[in-house]
């Protein structure tokens, strides 16, 4: 004990402890309802936040004397929204292919001083999974955001996606994980398959390598980072699953497959989750409308839902679109998980984001009512315990 006291005194004298570390910033939020997403709803609850983390949550919580109290009667607290699949705020020219570019990092495109980020904060999004861009995959159209390019699609290994907060004075302040996942653009032809398997096999023989073109694939092969795959048709999905059978530790996430409901048995068997747009689809070659998120959820495929359009308007309209999916049959609790904890799990960051639990980042929304009621408004947005948006 004496040695510990001497060590602490030495740290204070030599600057080993910062002022921030010595004095915790403590906040206590009192609200009518706290929807944790993973542990139910707490009525008349309290959340205690210290240094950006949730320290306590419940009904009968002792509030520290030093805490700043935010009393929000008649309000609901909900986790910050997580969009796992976006290109918003990115405008660098796309790259060509088919090719293997695992060293390409989307963080090198980040520019934080954009009105788009401020506006999607106001829409409740506290975390984004940003995709590496490719010729034939996305192109920026002023006023509309990122849409599929009409040119020949690039395929292969697109690079490393980033996980970011949509706020910060510089790119470093935005980054949650600069190499959060590996992105593959898949097509079921021999050339694309050879590009992918050649890169993976090469990395498999260099598992201790730290080379920029190898390390991301090593981490993907080990399942230490997820692998997001853009795969458009049921047939392509079956080809993909067959191709990647030898690499069985990879954590696959399918992106954008509107017909994935046709291969649900294979997805359930492999425990592969899917990212879907918030929209009611038309069944192929018919005028029949179908709720694909509902169909996958009922088949016990884990889903995450992203905005229908990858622009500001799509993000601002997101909760209304989720409410429409629920009205059309999507289970309400699954819908809430599909916009919070499920995308966090797919990105591999559920240990710190996606729900309101002790130990996690205090990323939360203060709402006027239920998050899936059309009339609900977002009063405040917090990221790591700091208010980053307030409604006028």
Q: What does each model-identified segment do?
A:
Residues 34, 38-78:
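Histidine-rich, glycine-flanked metal-binding segment
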Residues 32, 47, 52, 74, ...:
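Divalent metal-coordination and catalytic microenvironments
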Residues 93-95, 100-104, 226, 268, ...:
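His/Asp/Glu-enriched, well-ordered alpha-helical/loop segment
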Residues 121-238, 242-251:
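Polyanionic/metal-chelating signatures
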Residues 32-35, 43-45, 345, 357-392:
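C-terminal cap of metal-dependent C-N hydrolases
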Residues 7-18:
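Bacterial N-terminal signal peptides
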Residues 20-25:
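Boundary at the C-terminal end of the N-terminal hydrophobic targeting segment
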């Amino acid at each position: 004990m004496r040695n510990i006291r001497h060590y602490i005194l030495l740290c204070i004298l030599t600057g080993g402890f910062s002022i921030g570390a010595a004095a915790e910033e403590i906040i206590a939020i009192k609200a009518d309802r706290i929807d944790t997403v993973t542990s139910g709803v707490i009525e008349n609850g309290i959340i205690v936040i210290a240094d950006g983390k949730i320290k306590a949550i419940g009904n009968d919580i002792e509030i520290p004397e030093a805490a700043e109290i935010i009393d929000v009667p008649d309000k609901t607290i909900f986790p910050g929204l997580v969009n796992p699949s976006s290109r918003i705020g990115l405008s660098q020219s796309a790259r060509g292919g088919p090719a293997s570019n695992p060293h390409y990092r989307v963080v090198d495109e980040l520019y934080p001083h954009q009105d788009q980020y401020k506006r999607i904060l106001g829409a409740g999004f506290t975390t984004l999974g940003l995709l590496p861009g490719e010729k034939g995959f996305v192109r920026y159209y002023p006023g509309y955001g990122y849409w599929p390019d009409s040119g020949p699609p690039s395929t292969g290994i697109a690079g490393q996606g980033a996980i970011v907060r949509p706020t910060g004075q510089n790119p470093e302040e935005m980054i949650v994980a600069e190499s959060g996942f590996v992105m593959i653009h898949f097509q079921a032809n021999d050339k694309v398959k050879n590009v992918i398997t050649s890169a993976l096999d090469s990395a498999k023989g260099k598992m201790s390598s730290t080379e920029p073109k190898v390390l991301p694939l090593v981490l993907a092969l080990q399942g230490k980072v997820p692998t997001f795959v853009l795969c458009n048709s049921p047939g392509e999905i079956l080809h993909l699953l067959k191709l990647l059978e030898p690499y069985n530790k990879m954590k696959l996430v399918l992106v954008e497959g509107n017909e994935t409901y046709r291969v649900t048995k294979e997805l359930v068997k492999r425990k592969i989750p899917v990212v879907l747009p918030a929209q009611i689809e038309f069944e192929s070659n018919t005028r029949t409308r179908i709720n694909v998120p509902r169909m996958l959820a009922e088949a016990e495929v884990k889903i995450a839902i992203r905005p229908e359009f990858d622009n500001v308007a799509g993000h601002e309209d997101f909760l209304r679109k989720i409410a429409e999916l629920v009205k059309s049959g999507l289970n309400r609790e699954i819908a809430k998980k599909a916009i919070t904890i499920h995308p966090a799990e797919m990105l591999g960051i559920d240990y710190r984001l996606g729900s309101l639990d002790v130990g996690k980042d205090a990323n939360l929304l203060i709402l006027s009512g239920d998050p899936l009621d059309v009339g609900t408004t977002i009063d405040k947005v917090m990221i790591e315990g700091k208010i980053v948006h307030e409604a006028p």
